[in-house]
Amino acid sequence: MCGIIGIASNKPVSSTIINSLKKLEYRGYDSAGIATLSNGIVSEAKSEGRVDILEKNSIVKNMIGSIGIGHVRWATHGVPNTLNAHPHSSENVSVVHNGIIENSTILKKFLVGKGHIFKSQTDTEVIVHLITEYLKELNLKEAIIKTLKQLHGSFALGIIFKDQPDLIVGARRGSPLAVGYGPSENYLGSDSYALKSMTNKISYLNDGEFCIIKKDHVEFFDEEGLKVNKKVLELSSKEQDYDKGDFKHFMAKEIEEQPATLKNCINEYVDKINNDINIYNFPWNISDISSITLIGCGTAYHSCLMAKYWFEENTSLEVAVDIASEFRYRKNRFKKDNLYIFVSQSGETADTYAALDLCNQNDMKTCSIVNVVESSIARDSNFVLPIHCGPEIGVASTKAFMGQMLVLYILVLKLGRLREDFDKETYLDKIKELKKLPKLVEDTLLTENKIQAVSGSFTDAKGSMFLGRGFSYPIALEGALKLKELAYVHAEGYPAGEMKHGPLALIEDGMPVVVLAPRDNYYKKTISNMQEVIARGAKVLLITNKSKDEVFSENIWETILVESANDDLLPFLLTVPLQKLAYYSALLKGYDIDKPRNLAKSVTVE
């Protein structure tokens, strides 16, 4: 879960690399480093912590090299410190790496036997010494080919050589890597987002490929060293400006943007004239699909779980939901009439991509729901449904989660209608209600003051629980995850009906418990479960929707009301106060809300 950048140019590159690393910090921010090459001398600087600290380093300010590589790190092997920060170097070779080398211990033993001395605790350093060892007898290209064949695991690499003053080598297996093209300079980066400020012309390396980048041309090779021709893709535009504006944090801005991003997504999929949902170029006949498997990680998994309830409520399709890291290692019974849907904000989630690759190897029907349409998951899927929510910078997903749920719900309505699971009138009624969603979310955002007031009870607690039934259960899971991610408070989401089967033992006097009890078919049962935790001393924060009827329950600590809507849309509205709760809890504790500890936005390692 690191980010790499490389630039071969005819002018100094250090400031451009630093700016690109700032855009890659969503991939990791434990440490950062840069190396540039000029007149046969490699200048290198590293820092623990953010790129801002690296930028202030006097070595960086004096770098004049026109060839350079940079790195932001999320630690996998070795503690996050300057010694373990990238680049890692020998006398002649400097490497930046995203991924995990699974056989690093074996390779290190071999290299130590050859007299190599290791300085760090990282797996990356074996790559440096392998290349150095093979360069004793082989030319550069041969040494790269031999090195890559020795590595087990995943990697995206940027490599410079003291005695090769005009080039960068890039290579990938399992981790994404892109090449960008500019005037008198070319670029290497973990993804298009890192390169968009410099170019909108990009090529992507496939698994096992490597490239040699110079300022005026780029060559691509397969794992045997044979030349590969690459298409140059022109992205829709250069970098989209995105800053915090008047908000203190990106997350706060992204929460407030949700009415606009939902409206934008609805406009992309719903025809304004006939109110029909348009999913263009859907590649399969609906009669060829009898079941669906939804696959994701973290927040994306929660959106998949939410969609399962919608599919089962509105269609006759059989639906399974799986965590990508579990799906990819099980003995799966692949079915030709099953549609596999992969959900990922970044489109680069390693386990989700591996699950997709497994399905592609078995010639399955694959569809992806992503925010980044140039991503690996999008490129390798048969069909892509973008969520159209714009850049999301905060590590804890907010508007992307809403966008994932929205696109999944739109797909539910379209497939349900095509299968004639409901009539046209019902279909049009549901779309009519859907178009009201942005305004409903906008109105629900006004609950801010009460959420701010209750958040202190969560920051002081040893732990908390989030309970829901039916449609509300996936949202309870998401609410608990957000509190864990941002406020570092232990929180668990449970089906409300499961409390008597063990979790009730954890309830103690004063423990905050969030109960999601919208006035749906499960309302009365959920209120009964709420009473059970109140009876054992819990402080219950009830979140329900507005109604003329009062909640008949005593000793509720606080109640937050969201707007009313049909049952399908209530999960969107219940999500908003949970996002705010996590935000204000973290704010009270003074934590870094946009970049919580130990986490990264794009999870590109297993």
Residue ranges and their predicted role:
Residues 258-262, 266-293, 383-512, 586-606:
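Active-site phosphate/pyrophosphate-binding segments
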Residues 66-83, 271-284, 307-343, 490-506:
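Glycine-rich oxoanion-binding loops at beta->alpha junctions
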Residues 24-33, 98-102, 170-179, 247-251, ...:
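Conserved phosphate/anionic-ligand binding catalytic regions in large, soluble enzymes, centered on
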